[in-house]
Amino acid sequence: GHAAANCALARVATALTRRVPASRHGLAEGGTPPWTLLLAVAAVTVLGVVAVSLLRRALRVRYRFARPAALRA
């Protein structure tokens, strides 16, 4: 799951880096950014938030289980 998410993030990141210069040029001329770029940015932010929340939850569970053992010792 995490590996697939990382691969997807890497693909989106490479796609974004390829599209960003063109979109910057378009913005400089007063054009609106393409919807695909906006959707890609939204997808990256959503994936990032989900990944962070999952990591926090996993760390919380581990910490919760580890704490009583540490207190007993």
From Swiss-Prot:
Disulphide bond pairs: none
Cellular location(s): Virion membrane
Domain of life from the UniProt record: Viruses
Keywords on record: Membrane, Transmembrane, Transmembrane helix, Viral envelope protein, Virion
Virion surface side: 1-34
Membrane topology, from the record: Single-pass membrane protein
Protein family: Belongs to the chordopoxvirinae L1 protein family.
Annotated organism of origin: Orf virus (strain NZ2) (OV NZ-2)
Protein's name according to its UniProt entry: Protein F9 homolog
Predominant cellular place of this UniProt entry's protein: virion
The keyword DNA damage is annotated on this UniProt entry: no
Spans through the membrane: 35-55
Intravirion topological domain: 56-73
Entry GO terms, CC: membrane; viral envelope; virion membrane
